[in-house]
Structure formats: C-alpha cells, structure tokens
Amino acid sequence: MSDITVTNWAGNITYTAKELLRPHSLDALRALVADSARVRVLGSGHSFNEIAEPGDGGVLLSLAGLPSVVDVDTAARTVRVGGGVRYAELARVVHARGLALPNMASLPHISVAGSVATGTHGSGVGNGSLASVVREVELVTADGSTVVIARGDERFGGAVTSLGALGVVTSLTLDLEPAYEMEQHVFTELPLAGLDPATFETVMAAAYSVSLFTDWRAPGFRQVWLKRRTDRPLDGFPYAAPAAEKMHPVPGMPAVNCTEQFGVPGPWHERLPHFRAEFTPSSGAELQSEYLMPREHALAALHAMDAIRETLAPVLQTCEIRTVAADAQWLSPAYGRDTVAAHFTWVEDTAAVLPVVRRLEEALVPFAARPHWGKVFTVPAGELRALYPRLADFGALAGALDPAGKFTNAFVRGVLAG
C-alpha cells in the first residue's frame, strides 16, 4: 500500500503517513492505537509546522469520526468534551446551558484538544491559556489502555500542553462559569511613542480582552480591539480614536467575517473570537509565528520589533499583541510567568518568511521568547531547555507513558533533545 499525504490548513506542510485512520468508536480507536507502531493525531490542521507528521511509516489518526461528546454538568460547572470537538460547537452547547468558558482564541474553528496541547490562548491580563481551565485529561496510551490524569496528580503539569506526545486525548474536562455578555470596541492609531511601561499596562488592562494590531510599516498600532464584559465597567479609552467602520485585523480583508463591533452586546462566544463561527475558512494564504515573553519585557520587545520593521513589513500581513496570565503547564509558553504574546501572520511564501523569522528570533533573544508550538519557528532544540525549565520533567513523563515512543516524531524528538 502506498503512503497517503495530507496538507494542513495553510497548505505549507504536507504530512505523509502509511494510513489516515478515522475510527468511529473508542473501542476501535484503542485497537488501532495498540496495533500501530507510530501514531500522530491530526486535529483541525491549524498548525503551521511538522508537529503532526508521523514519520517512520506511522499513521495519522483523525478523531472526526468519533461521536461528538459535549457533556455539561451544570451543578459542578464543568463540561466533558470529546477529543475531536471544536470550540464553536462546544461554546454553543455550553452557552445553551447558561454557562461559559472564560476565554477563547481568535478563531473558533480549532479543536479543543489540539489547542490546549499546543498552548493556544486568547488575550487578557487576567486570562490564562486555554489549557488553564482543563481539570482532567483522558488518554489512550500506547497499549490501547485508558489513563486519566486530573488536577492534583503530580503528572498533571505535563498532561495538558503535551504536544500529542503522551497518547491520544479522547476527552477533556473543563471548568466553566456562568454565561455572560460582551461588547467589542475597535480603535485606530495607537502610537508606540506614546507608550511607557505603565501606559502599556493600562492599555492592555483596559478591557477583559485586548489586542493590538500593526503591520509594522510605521511605528505604533493600526488597530486596538477591546472586548468588554458587560458586567464590568469600561471607563473610556483616550489613547486612540474609535473606528469609523467595521474592521478586519488584516487590512483589505472583508470585515463581514469578523465578530460584531461598535459595542453591540452579545454572547461571550460571539465576541471573544475575532472571527465568526459561521465563517468557515477553507484554506489560509498565510503562515503564522508567535513568541511569548515575560510581560515586564513587553515595551522593550516592542521597540526591538520596531527596530527591524523594515525587515518585517515586506512579508507581514499583520502582527497581534496580546497578554496571557501565567499558568502551570510545563510546556506552556506562559508557564510560570505573566506573558505578552507577539503573533505574526505572514504572507504565504516560506522561502521569504524563514529568514525574517530567524532575524526576529535574534531580536527577541534578550527577552526569553518562547515560540508557539504549532507555528513556524527556527529556535534550535538546544535553546529550548533554557526556555522551558520543566522540559526534562516532561521528557520523563513521556518516557513513562510511552516508553517505545509510539507518539513521538521528529518534531517531538527535537523538542525533547533540548
């Protein structure tokens, strides 16, 4: 049988596998895992590197054929969600039961399991990564057996943001809170020169979730997106002018795809993402990178980016600045430190983008910038150990749960070799 190929959402990566398996029951999944020599799980495909490449004659496993599980416990304010469920579906079910997630990423079309496995996040000085609300992980391990790791287990710090290296995540249990409404306000032209460390903190704390956007063609930020919970005050925003029309983070792109703006109230899950769930992206003419740094270095890091903006701008569609509260997941880019995140949406030209990524990484070295695991980066494996102080502990956990390395690949081995 010849190998099959699968491309990611952006089309910049082609995964090669012996087979693409789509089990329709947990029993079938357990049998397939036990019978396969090497396994990687294919989520929603919104990664931009080879994290899902099985290699070595391995198989790709899709959870899309499994029954969709979203079991809400309203009394406990928790939800058990299946490994193949995406945030848009989860949010609709949870909201219908009068509950909510505390945060979401910019795109609601991504899978829950894949998002928390790579440290994906939204924004907000008080909001942790998406993994921070996980209270329990259910895994199918290398021999096909099920292992449950819950908050309080000494292994839990390595079990959620795990890069798919421990087993197949078949379900996650998440903490919820009462449903709330939000409104979104967009402002334009926030000068970098007007920001000192205290003002930057004030800007990023001006609402429940704040994002700054720039194309680095000039100093400063072209757009500021404030997402306010209606049960919390917004005392004005004197640092930039209100937008005169609905905006898209990427100049020239249709704003109809974005969530409601101009302060129109709506459910949390229709305001926290930047993009509407009804808008289903079929492919993305883009590459993405992201680097997360201690928040106390935010302004210095922004000036370091501004110093190389003539290098960045020609291959950049937009750059988004967000904040993430510290969390306790060993491989989370926000592990142990309140964080500022700089996300880059590049043009779809790998040859042109990679040299710029390397130059950017050089500029951010003084700020201990951790790369997002699911995006384009070139940080050498040898530098990751200094960036992730619990990397050796994670390697020991992976070795204990998967001693033969069934769930590893070249990407994971490179990380663990750090």
Curated annotation (Swiss-Prot):
The modification Pros-8alpha-FAD histidine is found at residue 46. Changing residue 46 to A: Does not contain FAD, and shows no oxidase activity. D-sorbitol binds at residues 106, 320, 322, 345, 375. Keywords: FAD, Flavoprotein, Oxidoreductase. The keyword Cell membrane does not apply. FAD binds at residues 41-47, 106, 111, 114, 118-121, 169, 322, 372. Residues 13-179 form the FAD-binding PCMH-type domain. Gene3D superfamilies: 3.30.465.10, 3.30.70.2520, 3.30.70.2530, Uridine Diphospho-n-acetylenolpyruvylglucosamine Reductase, domain 2, Vanillyl-alcohol Oxidase, Chain A, domain 4. Its EC number is 1.1.3.41. Its cofactor is FAD. Binds 1 FAD covalently per subunit. It catalyses: an alditol + O2 = an aldose + H2O2; xylitol + O2 = D-xylose + H2O2; D-sorbitol + O2 = D-glucose + H2O2. InterPro entries: ALO_C, FAD-bd_PCMH, FAD-bd_PCMH-like_sf, FAD-bd_PCMH_sub1, FAD-bd_PCMH_sub2, FAD_lactone_oxidase-like, Oxid_FAD_bind_N, Vanillyl_alc_oxidase_C-sub2. GO terms for cellular component: membrane. Oxidase that performs selective oxidation of the terminal primary hydroxyl group of several alditols, with a reduction of O2 to H2O2. Shows highest activity on xylitol and D-sorbitol, and a poor efficiency with D-mannitol and L-threitol. Belongs to the oxygen-dependent FAD-linked oxidoreductase family. Monomer. This is Alditol oxidase. It comes from Streptomyces coelicolor (strain ATCC BAA-471 / A3(2) / M145).
